[in-house]
């Protein structure tokens, strides 16, 4: 099939939006919206502060669903765990281990509670420094002025003309012209009081050095890295968080590559799996089947289902009905099998 002609993707804009979402959930590695922003995928690292270390998934599920009033239950579902660079779909008896990277599908209204349940009670970002006033940094600053105006933002841009341009375009952002590695300039940006520094230049090596400067100033950092080899070395290099623009762009394209009623896709863990939002059509093989009886491939885990206007965590006996919207993790080897379940018959 040909790619739709109206598919226009701006990588810089998508990356800026991705970072802006991360700022709403400090501590998360990814915050990805699904179902018109009703659901979010969180990726978190299980650290020493997590109270759920050594807890089995069945116990975590029971903990999230312990309220007699179901509306108060935590609508969050662990879809996958990455351990020692291997992604797997956990069984109910599996336990969380320190260092695990977990992927959680959660109702957007329960993001803060979910973060807290996993030991992330970071204070909201109040002061932010952006190094690099290119398209990513500029678009991010614009979004923050519009959607998170309570955050104080400073941009350091090396090019004088570009500095003047973005200063003219932004109304509530401090724009400084100079080298992002200049300690005097960082002091002028008040790095000592900053909650986060973003290294968003178009040079990987510069961004890595900037992260080291941020660490020296006891400031958390997020950096953009285009070379995946650097991404693999982030722990050795002491980098706290890395944004990979290619991963974000690929995920936007995947929706249009898949067959069937696929609404959105996000690739995870070096494309070992995908998080998919798909709609059940009247011709689907899944209609009127319970979750446990559905023909889901082995490498697929259903996280949440939207039935009409209600979002639920499905049980084994949950019946799949027409127009249900299903959010699931699917390992790459089983993607084609999953596509078949959501295809219109005429597409076979």
Task: Locate predicted features.
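Cytosolic regulatory regions of ion transport systems
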Residues: 1-348
